[in-house]
Amino acid sequence: MAPGARISLLLLITFTLLGPQRSGAFPAMPLSSLFANAVLRAQHLHQLVADTYKEFERTYIPEAQRHSIQSTQTAFCFSETIPAPTGKDEAQQRSDVELLRFSLLLIQSWLSPVQFLSRVFTNSLVFGTSDRVYEKLRDLEEGIQALMQELEDGSSRGGLVLKTTYDKFDTNLRSDEALLKNYGLLSCFKKDLHKAETYLRVMKCRRFVESSCAF
């Protein structure tokens, strides 16, 4: 065989072997790694939003008013209108596929509102991280979708739809009404991320028994 023909054949074999690895957005990963990555993303994002909530509260909400405001914030959380588990015990009664669908629904309900987050919070080190929230939210969405593809054998099935979505964050921080609105939205965002994190940790723990299951 001529040298040129041998080189062409070698290149053809090389590209054939590399082709399947480059066909997807992410390389194939074990299910345990997919769960571990999703849990870490959810934990980090939940903590980031919790810190932002605390900083917003400290900066804009008088301490004497916090309790009365917090007691009425549940009305802002549209996620309460879906039959999602409210805690670890309830989550353990649901299948993994159900929990993934609830998690995805909660995450996707915030993709639009959080795009305005960085325009609202610009004067603090904590608020300065808010421009990363959308990116991290999309990363978590992709992680959950990857898990759903694995558990549903790659099929795409319809799920629940949140009929009422969250409003965008208000950029007018000089208005008391806007401050209360943003405070309520941050509270709901924090609660919804806590739910999603809980669901992912429940699934990971019952599939891969480990010491961190106590939470």
From Swiss-Prot:
Keyword tags: Disulfide bond, Hormone, Metal-binding, Phosphoprotein, Secreted, Signal, Zinc
Pfam family membership, one: Hormone_1
GO terms assigned for molecular function: growth factor activity; growth hormone receptor binding; hormone activity; metal ion binding
Keyword Protein biosynthesis carried by entry: no
One Gene Ontology cellular component annotation held by this UniProt entry: extracellular space
InterPro entries xrefs: 4_helix_cytokine-like_core, Somatotropin, Somatotropin/Prolactin, Somatotropin_CS
Highest taxon, organism lineage: Eukaryota
Chief location category: secreted
GO biological process: animal organ development; growth hormone receptor signaling pathway; positive regulation of growth; positive regulation of receptor signaling pathway via JAK-STAT; response to nutrient levels
Residues that bear Phosphoserine: 130
CDD domains found in the cross-reference section: somatotropin_like (cd10285)
Annotated positions binding Zn(2+): 44, 197
Localization of this protein: Secreted
Disulfide bonds: 77-188, 205-213
First and last residue of the signal peptide: 1-25
Stated family: Belongs to the somatotropin/prolactin family.
Main function: Plays an important role in growth control. Its major role in stimulating body growth is to stimulate the liver and other tissues to secrete IGF1. It stimulates both the differentiation and proliferation of myoblasts. It also stimulates amino acid uptake and protein synthesis in muscle and other tissues.
Name of this chain's protein: Somatotropin
